């Protein structure tokens, strides 16, 4: 049975993520990390979901039962867990979050001692232990060998200092008015402090989590409220984070949502202008717009493609010795400062770019025009191999013949089929998307 999806383990709390399942997974992961243990410490953080308490307690019970000492730091962004795991010399870090999903869902993400998400082969090794009944039941410790757990509430200061260190020292934010939407999620404490301490005039919305309102019509998936507040407040920039703050959506001074590929392009060129790129490559996923590749090429930068998911972006960056890359969804990695997507690091870099450009953000963040793209997320009841669907191959051949770029895949975290089409003719794009929707609705819904 496969446990891991494209971003850790995710599911409905109390259905897939039951206390027994979480404890078993915690023991399996702990036994895997113990093979290379240096400090016998594991760090645990979470977002603001109500079910986070249940999942956290199950993980603590599991890990201490096999002798691990656990450090609990409460609600913190996912990238903070990645940073603090390495900074505090832990064997591993665990983030309890379902990211942008509704509050009923939850998830578990694992980081190695260097703050990187686990590779697929590492996840498979944990799955093998998960299914090894004899090994699991022979691993409990007794007496003084049982692990301990302690809660530390002041590590937020380390992460705030780290974020401020990522911002250019010769700049401050005193000339910028910024609206922050923290999605009632993990960034609700950190984000306002960072931007205020750097001098910005800050308005914060959706910063009152109650355990059930994370991502609820707010944050990176629902930036319309942020757009309205930016216009109302006459702000220079707006930043929306998702529930665990590893994703960023940017709104310019006119209230326009800045496309993720435009962000990747302009930030890549900005990093190059500061001689901050470790190579002449920028990494993006297969979903990236062709216009991004053309723009980067015009700036003497090469675009490297990878599979969808920020951990695959990170792996491709390491492979190509690149220190910048991301997804158009807003997971953007500056690996000099973060091993995974960090919405706050990215927001600070966008702010620095706008300041140094001496332009309003609607100009500074609009460096090129995109080719028409259409993305549809289709709810599905089943997930058979797409190649097994009668007529699927013929559809793809027709798209290729019409020079329509296509990427069709199942979501790794939800019961959805994602359909992405890109073409120079927008009307043709719309008609073919409708045709594809009808085809898949007939086969999968």
Swiss-Prot record:
GO terms for cellular component: cytosol. The keyword Magnesium applies. It holds the Pfam family PGM_PMM_III. The active site is at 99 (phosphoserine intermediate). Binds 1 Mg(2+) ion per subunit. It catalyses: alpha-D-glucosamine 1-phosphate = D-glucosamine 6-phosphate. Catalyzes the conversion of glucosamine-6-phosphate to glucosamine-1-phosphate. PANTHER family: PHOSPHOGLUCOMUTASE (ALPHA-D-GLUCOSE-1,6-BISPHOSPHATE-DEPENDENT), PHOSPHOHEXOSE MUTASE. This is Phosphoglucosamine mutase. The gene is glmM.
């Amino acid at each position: 049975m496969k446990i891991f999806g494209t971003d850790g383990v995710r599911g409905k709390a109390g259905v897939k993520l039951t206390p027994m399942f979480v404890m078993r997974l915690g023991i399996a992961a702990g036994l895997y990390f113990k093979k290379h243990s240096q400090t016998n410490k594991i760090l645990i953080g979470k977002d603001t979901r109500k079910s986070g308490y249940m999942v956290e307690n199950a993980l603590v019970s599991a890990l201490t039962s096999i002798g691990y000492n656990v450090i609990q730091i409460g609600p913190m962004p996912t990238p903070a867990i990645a940073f603090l795991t390495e900074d505090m010399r832990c064997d591993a870090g665990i983030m309890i979050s379902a990211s942008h999903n509704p509050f009923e869902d939850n998830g578990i993400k694992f980081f190695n001692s260097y703050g990187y998400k686990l590779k697929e082969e590492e996840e498979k090794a944990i799955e093998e232990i998960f299914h090894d009944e004899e090994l699991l039941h022979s691993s409990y410790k007794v007496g003084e060998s049982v692990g301990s757990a302690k809660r530390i509430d002041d590590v937020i200061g380390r992460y705030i200092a780290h974020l401020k260190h990522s911002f250019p020292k010769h700049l401050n934010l005193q000339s910028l008015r910024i609206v922050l939407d923290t999605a009632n999620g993990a960034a609700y404490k950190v984000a306002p402090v960072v931007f205020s301490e750097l001098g910005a005039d800050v308005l914060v919305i959706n910063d009152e989590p109650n355990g059930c309102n994370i991502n609820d019509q707010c944050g990176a998936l629902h930036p319309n409220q942020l757009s309205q507040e930016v216009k109302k407040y006459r702000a220079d920039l707006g930043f929306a984070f998702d529930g665990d703050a590893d994703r960023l959506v940017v709104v310019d001074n006119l209230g326009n949502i800045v496309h993720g590929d435009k962000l990747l392009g302009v930030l890549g060129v900005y990093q190059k202008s500061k001689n901050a790129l470790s190579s002449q490559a920028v990494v993006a996923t297969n979903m990236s717009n062709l216009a991004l590749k053309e723009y980067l090429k015009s700036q003497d930068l090469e675009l490297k493609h990878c599979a969808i998911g920020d951990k695959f972006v990170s792996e491709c960056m390491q492979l190509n010795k690149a220190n910048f890359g991301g997804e158009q969804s807003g997971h953007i990695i500056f690996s000099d400062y973060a091993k995974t997507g960090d919405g706050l690091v990215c927001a600070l870099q966008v702010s620095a770019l706008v300041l140094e450009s001496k332009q309003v953000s609607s100009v500074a963040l609009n460096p090129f025009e995109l080719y028409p793209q259409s993305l549809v997320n289709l709810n599905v009841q089943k997930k058979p191999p797409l190649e097994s669907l009668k007529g699927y191959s013929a559809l793809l051949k027709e798209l290729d013949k019409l020079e329509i770029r296509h990427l069709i895949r199942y979501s790794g975290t939800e019961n959805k089929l994602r359909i992405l089409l890109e073409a120079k003719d927008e009307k043709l794009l719309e008609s073919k998307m409708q045709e594809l929707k009808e085809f898949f609705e007939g086969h999968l819904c």
